[in-house]
Design a protein with these regions (language model features):
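A feature for the membrane-embedded catalytic helix bundles of lipid/isoprenoid biosynthetic enzymes
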Residues: 1-40, 117-233
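Helix-boundary and loop/linker segments of multi-pass membrane transporters
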Residues: 15, 43, 73-77
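Membrane-embedded alpha-helical segments that form the functional core of polytopic membrane enzymes
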Residues: 50-111, 143, 202-216
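Acidic active-site catalytic centers that drive phospho-/nucleotidyl reactions
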Residues: 95-98, 116, 120
Length: 233
């Protein structure tokens, strides 16, 4: 079977065609999607599948975290941090690439969605772990790491139990532009705090501790809200 040309590919993989027409997304997100669709087409022509690049992306996150950790906490090296974060940026960019590419496959894999979510989940968890270390306090680190486990377990499993009148907490910590989203936390807040840590460790640790307390308070509120949903036995 012959390969599709770009027009045929985009009709199948991204029917919207022009990402900038999506007003619900920001200009940066749409610009990234514009380039991601074209990179998807290149991978398609090369015979590389969405599952393959998702696995590559997950593996790429490992050296990215090692370099970011060393550059920020051990060496205070801004150049090395930029290199590490460029690797992390590649992991995040691939998450935009594999979606259109997956639509060209003849098969739908039962674990396809889980595999697609793996790299951004690794990116989020890894940045949360490093963020906790930036407090320079074992108690704050332990609290934040425990909270990270909460975010990936209890929070995800109880989304349906948030009542409509309390949906403000969804927007605060569980929406596309929430304080824990990839766009806000991983792509913006985390690198800014790391750079601050490299140049002014005392100020950075203070800000990290304040943010950790903020996230913990929101997690406690989440638990309280979900416990309000109950039925009689």
């Amino acid at each position: 079977m012959s390969k599709m040309n770009f027009d045929q590919f985009i009709d199948k993989a991204f029917p919207v065609r022009n990402p900038f027409s999506r007003n619900e997304f920001g200009g940066v997100t749409n610009a990234i999607k514009y380039f991601a669709v074209r990179v998807s087409f290149i991978f398609y022509r090369l015979g590389i599948t969405a599952n393959q690049i998702s696995l590559f992306s997950a593996l790429l996150a490992i050296p990215a975290f090692v370099i970011i950790y060393q550059a920020t906490i051990e060496e205070a090296n801004i150049i090395k941090f930029i290199v590490g974060y460029l690797l992390m940026g590649t992991v995040l960019f691939i998450d935009f690439v594999d979606g259109p590419l997956s639509k060209t496959s003849k098969y739908k894999y039962f674990v396809g969605d889980d595999l697609d979510n793996l790299p951004p989940d690794i990116a989020t968890m890894g940045t949360l772990l490093i963020f906790g270390l930036l407090s320079n306090n074992i108690y704050f680190t332990a609290l934040f790491w425990t909270n990270a486990v909460f975010l990936f377990t209890y929070l995800r499993n109880t989304l349906i139990h948030i009542p409509k009148e309390k949906e403000w907490i969804l927007r605060l910590i569980c929406s596309r532009f929430s304080l824990l989203s990839v766009r806000v936390f991983v792509a913006t807040l985390f690198p800014l705090v790391c750079i601050m840590y490299i140049y002014n460790q005392e100020l950075a640790t203070t800000i990290v501790k304040i943010l950790i307390l903020f996230y913990l308070i929101n997690s406690a509120l989440w638990i309280r809200i979900t416990l309000e949903t109950k039925i009689k036995k």
